[in-house]
Amino acid sequence: MSEEAKPWSMARVITASSAGTAFEWYDFFIFGSLTPVIAKIFLAGLDPTSALIAALALFAVGFAFRPLGAIIFGAMGDRVGRKATFLTTVSLMGGATFAIGLLPTYATAGIIAPILLVFLRICQGTALGGEYGGAAIYVAEHAANNKRGEATGWIQSSASIGLLAALLVIVATRTALGEEAFNAWGWRIPFLASSILLVISLWMRIKLSESPTFAKLRDEGGTSKAPLREAFARRDSLKQVLIAFFAIMCAQGAVWYFTFFYLQVFLEKSLGLPAATKDMLLIAMTLVSAPLYVFFGWLSDRVGRKPVMLGGMLLALALYFPGSHLIASSVNPALVAAQAASPVVVVTDPATCTVQFDPTGTRRFESACDIAKSLLVARGISYAEATSPDGTTAIRVGSGTLAVPGGEALDDPGLKALKTATGDQLKTQLVTAGYPASADPEAVHYPTLLLVLFGFVVAATALYGPQAAALVEMFPTKIRYTAMSLPYHVGTGWVGGFLPVTSFAIVAITGDIYAGLWYAVGFTALSAVVTILFLKETRGKPLEEC
């Protein structure tokens, strides 16, 4: 059997493998985009805020179980084979996604509805843990040594296909049915439509043969009997796993998720850009990114994986703070001007302030200090903090002052009413001081905004494009599936997945809307240092020598 696929079959290998990865991202964006609807449908027994938090927790379940799936299906892929494993993962993933569209609602089934949803999310997350590694390895083990980066770059670009498919299906369904019908039953259609991707993906993958590299290893009796032990219990292979995580995946989780997720929150929540405008920017960024993954994969075949990925990290580090400030001044110049002319100061007793990190949504944040800070953070307003001489709390905006009462003695409805009333008073005071209620689309300087966003897209794709080839080339064939899957999903699921909530907590602690950038800066800088010191160049290296 040839070690390289013929050109016509290589196209089929790439297409079939990419379909499953596109499916992964389709599911990711569908569930994330429909979180508010899912909260109403499956968690109707909770109050709206708790329901939304619980729905976000359901979304996070997919991240939490990805490393488990990486272990299970990674070992399976190294023992049984690449083809059988990613047929299993795409079937489990597709079946679970389709089944969500058939679930009974809380109104008809009670508590059993969210229980079934949790089970299906666990199935999805576990399956996704084995999907990416299988697809990337399968393509890499078919590709010529001097074209491996370009070939696996197509796997990376499938994220764009999945995102666009999700956005188009949701928008088309909402437009055709109307908001009321969509919320009542139309939300099922995007999940049920996944069956089309599933059938196509299965049809293409069934026709594929086993990876030639793995088939040769299996025929020679060289497959691993205990891939988990060989990957993680042996010092040399464990060292490579750690380098893969710290040199590549920490940066990938930080840079990619910052670019395609955190920036969307920053634009809409912190800067007040209308959601429709933000969505159009996301679509534009996604379209631009699709060919860049392949380009940077191709470039890594010419100049090396290490310099291309390191270039992406360094570009991101150069852009994080100045780029974010440019985005702010381009999107909402009135906000930037108001913060300079009328800075906000929270005057309070620091002893009454708590760290506003609440991923479970169970804390009340009832002190006057916490109420003041949470109201400002929710509006994307930077603030300084000063000590109150008499222990009271007030928000000072320019020359105006708003007294903020505490809510320790109030029940939950009373506390909610207090926060709402104080928030309305704060809004009035901010407007009086020149703070805009939202960004004015007519005042946005789009050339600067698009240029900065393009810079972040280049950084993310330069890092992500060669990533699959680099990871594949770090490990021998007999443990490749196991060894590369775990660092990938810990990096994307945990480093990237926790980026929004951790960055928000940093903003709440410091009062600076830019302080959350330090999370991404820290992980990206760590990866850059580890890449320079420990990551070896593997461009063009035969997989048999890995």
Model-based region annotation:
Residues 31-32, 237-285, 323-324, 351-386, ...:
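Extracytoplasmic gate region of multi-pass secondary transporters
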Residues 35-66:
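Extracellular/periplasmic helix-loop-helix junction of adjacent transmembrane segments
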Residues 44, 91-110, 315-334, 432-440:
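C-terminal ends and interior cores of transmembrane alpha-helices
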Residues 56-75, 94-96, 283-296:
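Central cavity-lining transmembrane alpha-helices of secondary-active solute carriers
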Residues 79-91, 302-313:
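Cytoplasmic membrane-interface "Motif A"-like loop-to-helix N-cap segments
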Residues 109-129, 337-348, 443-462:
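Hydrophobic core of transmembrane alpha-helices in multi-pass small-molecule transporters
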Residues 150-174, 323, 485-499:
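Glycine-rich segments within core transmembrane alpha-helices of 12-TM secondary carriers
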Residues 325-451:
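Low-complexity, proline/glycine-enriched hydrophobic segments characteristic of transmembrane helices
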